[in-house]
């Protein structure tokens, strides 16, 4: 029988000298010579069977792997404690499980078996201690002389309404420097005198603070037109300036804003002066850049036990700081740098929270 040398290619077709039939020469890795005893059709059929067998073996391996995974999942579901051991999580003790392995009767008289509850991992349990429980914001009147708190007066606030439009379609709007530049120019007013956004920023900073939620903050607004407004600690100031403007227009027209669910007044216009609403033992100060600098925490440490403090902050772009000279005791500065009204409120808030231990 003639022999052929091994080729590098996978195989080739050659014509037999005896039968003149094409024969497929297949390369073998185990021998150096290849016999030509098989025809091309037989070899191609063998290759097809081998490929089908390889595919079948791969499918069998995949099925076997899926069966093993399913069996392991079923085993873990039957024994949940094994999952805790694998994750390294210690099971919590549950004392209020009632008859976990016994039968329990329901009110209708039927008996049913209780399902044993699986304890939660330790990391997913959030324990709330007593001091972390939120205290509802409450209004503290001037008659309360024992509760120590911070009183903030936003003085010279730019809250002024103006009738805009023609006679029939005229509407009242909150005067601001962005939308009413023509009106301000007509009234010969400075643009800095129409900045209600400063009051908006200060109210958001004050009323969102933990000090207010703990019931240790009281806020008053004294406008440039000598209108005094009392702010309820439970009020939620609108986040957008457009909605805040509409709320202020309604307040200055109706003189009060009531809550939807009750008769409680969230914002109301009260009579001057602001000192009528301060506790008798209150210490009063104004923030001024020209005054001696003292850190807010050190200033609070000079207070007497149960003594409240009232801080007057100018809610304006710029101007003199003599707006509260008639009723304050002193002027202080809390920074070596000029601060905005919102930042000044924030610094005093944080210092008062640290001083009272409010987290």
UniProtKB/Swiss-Prot annotation:
Its EC number is 2.1.1.-. This is Ribosomal RNA small subunit methyltransferase mra1. InterPro entries: Alpha/beta_knot_MTases, Rbsml_bgen_MeTrfase_EMG1/NEP1, tRNA_m1G_MTases_N. It comes from Schizosaccharomyces pombe (strain 972 / ATCC 24843). One of its GO terms (cellular component) is small-subunit processome. Keywords: Methyltransferase, Nucleus, Pheromone response, Phosphoprotein, Ribosome biogenesis, RNA-binding, rRNA processing, rRNA-binding, S-adenosyl-L-methionine, Transferase. The modification Phosphothreonine is found at residue 33. It comes from the Eukaryota. Residues 1-62, 98-118 are annotated as: Disordered. Belongs to the class IV-like SAM-binding methyltransferase superfamily. RNA methyltransferase NEP1 family. GO terms for molecular function: rRNA (pseudouridine) methyltransferase activity; rRNA binding.
